[in-house]
A protein has these predicted regions:
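Nucleotidyltransferase catalytic core that binds NTPs
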Residues: 4-182
Length: 182
């Protein structure tokens, strides 16, 4: 059985992440596919949203992908162990072009921590410098939240999340950010 998946911090989920989600779905073809949200949370400024809240918002923001979101394993090795236990033997991580090289390490665990007949890491595509989502990043979104800049924050959030819920997410991010975050 084949599976195509992605794994990311999504802190917070943004309109830019939708491009990755679409690429996973397209790459999957007749294979199953999932989007794994990391379990990382901290007060340092990189991971302000609690995993359960992040999953809640991701499902509201991207209802067409909601049944494909998973939250559980803490890293790619844990994900692959889980997928193997579900009967998958052909796995492919679909990640942003800037993450492909950094994810290659996972292959060295094939045959040790898990066993896949086929295991690969591919790009979901290059970021389009002229596209609407190029300027959106989790870091910029967290900075907008800390600056209490709702207009900038709102631009990175899909319209499927209403203003009230967008503001609530921004407030949750603010409450978990260090005071001097830049």
């Amino acid at each position: 059985m084949c599976i195509r998946d992605s794994f990311g911090r999504f802190q917070p989920p943004t309109v830019g992440h939708a491009e990755n989600f679409k690429a996973v779905k397209k790459t999957a073809g007749s294979c199953d596919w999932f989007i794994y949200l990391s379990q990382s949370v901290d007060a340092k400024g990189s991971n302000p949203l609690d995993p359960d809240r992040k999953l809640y918002y991701a499902k509201k923001m991207f209802p067409n992908f909601a049944k494909h979101f998973r939250s559980g394993p803490t890293d790619p090795v844990g994900i692959l162990k889980e997928l193997q236990s579900e009967g998958y033997d052909d796995a492919m991580f679909v990640v942003g072009s800037d993450r492909v090289q950094a994810m290659q390490w996972v292959k060295k665990y094939n045959g040790k921590d898990f066993f896949f007949r086929k295991l690969d890491v591919i790009s979901s595509g290059d970021r389009d410098a002229d596209g609407d989502t190029f300027a959106i990043s989790g870091t910029k979104m967290r900075r907008a939240a800390v600056a209490d800049d709702f207009d900038t924050f709102r631009k990175g959030i899909p319209k499927s999340l209403n203003d009230k819920d967008t503001r609530k997410m921004m407030e949750e991010i603010q409450s978990n950010m260090p005071k001097l975050y830049k």
